[in-house]
Regions:
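Acidic-glycine-rich active-site phosphate/pyrophosphate-binding loop
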Residues: 27-36, 86-101, 138-144, 193-200
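Phosphate/pyrophosphate-binding loops at sites that engage ATP/ADP/AMP, CoA/4′-phosphopantetheine
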Residues: 59-75
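Conserved beta-strand elements of the Class I
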Residues: 5, 75-78, 137, 176
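Condensing-enzyme catalytic core mediating Claisen C-C bond formation in acyl metabolism
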Residues: 1-48, 152-212
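Conserved catalytic cysteine-centered active-site region
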Residues: 35-54, 81-135
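Acidic, glycine-rich active-site loops and adjacent beta-strand->loop/helix elements
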Residues: 12, 80-85, 112-117, 140-145, ...
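Flexible, glycine-rich active-site loops centered on histidine and acidic residues
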Residues: 129-163
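Buried hydrophobic positions in well-ordered alpha/beta secondary-structure cores of metabolic enzymes
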Residues: 6-8, 34, 63, 77, ...
């Protein structure tokens, strides 16, 4: 089976910078406490006009431009995120629309938290090998600032927002191996909001019927 090699990357950060000093004014912490335990001095938060999808689009656009490829050459788009602005449409579909990627190619999200980008790479590798195509767009994007309790110093000091994107090329004689796993028994130790409870589903049924 062919392997993947990195052709180009892109990145995007939102507009609001939050320093350790900023956090020390809202929770019992300090720059020294955070830096010595995490190495983090500042993180970036989305402004009102930004979210995981807008960051993903910016990062993907930069990666595509750096690759020198045309949008039509991208065979699949996989985005890893647990903080998409909507359950549907996916971030990957928003990227597909914004960049003009072909509509007859797969585009979808995966949610595997911190390991999500690795899962997305593995998914892209499988798609290229089974469906054909040479290039994949893989994205990792989060807007965790909107999910974190700003009064909980065990989480608010760690998480921020941003996106990274990679154009990967399927190639002969390229070493490639991924080991994936999960420990669902520890799920009680990490939790997030019930996104499906926040808003009802909306759909223009007639319009969907016409293009489906």
């Amino acid at each position: 089976m062919k392997g993947l090699q990195l052709l180009a990357t892109g990145g995007a950060l939102p507009g609001r910078v939050v320093t350790n000093e900023d956090l020390s004014r809202q929770v019992d912490t300090s720059d020294e406490w955070i830096t010595t335990r995490t190495g983090i001095r500042q993180r970036y938060y989305c402004t009102e006009s930004e979210d995981a999808a807008t960051l993903a689009i910016a990062a993907a656009r930069q990666a595509l431009a750096r690759s020198g490829l045309a949008a039509s050459e991208i065979a699949c788009c996989v985005a890893a995120t647990l903080s998409a602005p909507t359950a549907t449409p996916s971030v990957a579909c928003r990227v597909q629309a914004a960049l003009g990627l072909p509509e007859n190619r797969p585009a979808f999200d995966v949610n595997a938290a911190c390991s999500g980008f690795i899962y997305a790479i593995a998914a892209a590798h499988g798609l290229l090998n089974t469906l054909g195509g040479r290039y994949a767009l893989v994205i990792g994007c989060e807007a965790l600032s909107r999910m974190v309790d700003p009064t909980d110093r065990t989480t608010c000091v760690l998480f921020g927002d941003g996106a990274g994107a990679a154009i990967l090329e399927l190639a002969e004689d390229v070493p490639f191996a991924v080991t994936l796993g999960a420990r669902g028994s520890e799920a009680i130790r990490v939790g997030g909001p019930a996104a499906c409870d926040t808003a009802p589903i909306t759909m223009d049924g007639k319009a969907v019927f016409r293009f489906a």
